[in-house]
């Protein structure tokens, strides 16, 4: 429930809400107002160890629960999430800042991930081939791997945890969850509803905190696998540290997603698509469009319409339905973003829409309005770096070939989009672009939960992505059985 009281956040270990054994806490502000709404503990190693012990004990019985029974239990959780959609969206807007419309969309995508997890019996099925030799049969069986952990970011406090723990638990594992210390309230509610669904104690454990919790997870010998979503430097650290300690790791990292706009595109829909991709959720998402490579032939017309429509966007508190761009997560991030905008100006890019100059009354929140640069090149920081904000760079290219070449020069390769009505252009783009997720006239090419989610290059560290069959393979181990009977 959302209240006006300042909340003292707790950990959830072995089926109980418990105080952290540490004394250090961090304030959690509402990004739209700057007012403190909670204090979250920065838990020490000892709390992680207790959570792992609880998960390890629960694994002994949970892993033996029949697969269909685990799925039925998850279906009860799914129903509770659906019944509480409105409340969950409001919590997201309160602590993350994104508009209620965006938060509602996130809730739905999270629910879809749990829907996938309820179908685990089908996804866990093995393979068999009888009579591989005289009187000998061969088969492959999938088993859970033990205690696994998830480390999740602030920008999707519901969807990303629900990519992880429902599927892992459906596969028979037990889970230790560490969500962002910037958005601890939604994590609490997810865990509350999980246990309302009747799960045994210790199957899911929540440890709040910062880097100490991350390091404790990565170094704990009883954790078999770690799922991570976050920035590129931290993803690299998580992957290298986790694998060094013998763990499976999937680490989804940063992005600099490009869109190529062709002269044969539907101009109106393309403009609205780019606006939605670049500026919704305040640009704080790894699938946001941050660079548009527009072909010269349509560049001026496209930019004129894009700028005019962008200037109509309202900035402010996400609870107000007229606002399109909410606040950034913290004052420190706002200052970082303003630094990037200033660097773009200093480097010679043309500032067409200046998000530093917000006309709406935005109070004390951490607001930066939609920002558009033209005349950007690959030498500029605003082209190279993940800004994670409503900042869009425009690069003019002569044709599709140059647009693809430009896009592939980025060190990131998460998502890429082409806007076109020409099937051959779409085919050429699909076959030659280096990105893990590709959209053709699709603004945000984040796949549905039954497909894998992962990028390439510096956008992903690991072998198996989240969701779909990739997720099931990550959270299970194979046993190949060759048998003969006398």
From Swiss-Prot:
One of its GO terms (biological process) is thymine catabolic process. The keyword Manganese does not apply. GO terms for molecular function: malonate-semialdehyde dehydrogenase (acetylating) activity; methylmalonate-semialdehyde dehydrogenase (acylating, NAD) activity. Gene3D superfamilies: Aldehyde Dehydrogenase, Chain A, domain 1, Aldehyde Dehydrogenase, Chain A, domain 2. CDD domains: ALDH_F6_MMSDH. Catalyzes the oxidation of malonate semialdehyde (MSA) and methylmalonate semialdehyde (MMSA) into acetyl-CoA and propanoyl-CoA, respectively. Is involved in a myo-inositol catabolic pathway. Bicarbonate, and not CO2, is the end-product of the enzymatic reaction. This is Malonate-semialdehyde dehydrogenase. It comes from Bacillus cereus (strain ATCC 10987 / NRS 248). The gene is iolA.
